[in-house]
Amino acid sequence: MTGFKKTKEGIVITATIPAGAIVFCINGSKCRTNKARIIDMGGHNEVLHSSYDDKFEYRLMQDIEIEDFNLLYSVECASGFHFFRTREEAEKYNV
C-alpha cells in the first residue's frame, strides 16, 4: 500500500506501508498506521517536519514505527502515522 502525507512545509511525501502493518481507514480516505517507510519527498533531500509535531522529522528512506499506536479503530485522530490514499487528497489537506 502507498500513502501520501503533507508536511509542515507543504510538501507531499510518499510512504509505503509494509505487509503486516496495522492500518485503519475510518472515512475511506484518511488513514493511520503503525509502520511506514518514506520513499519520496517531492524532490527534497533535506529534512521535512510533521505538521502535528514539528520536532518529528521525515527523512528519505526512513522507517517509521509508532510504538504507542492507538489500537482503537474508531478514534481517527490518535497516535499513528497519518496519511491519505491519494496524492490529490494529501495536496488538498490544509496543514
Please annotate each region the language model reported.
Residues 1-95:
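Short, glycine-biased loop/turn motifs at secondary-structure junctions and
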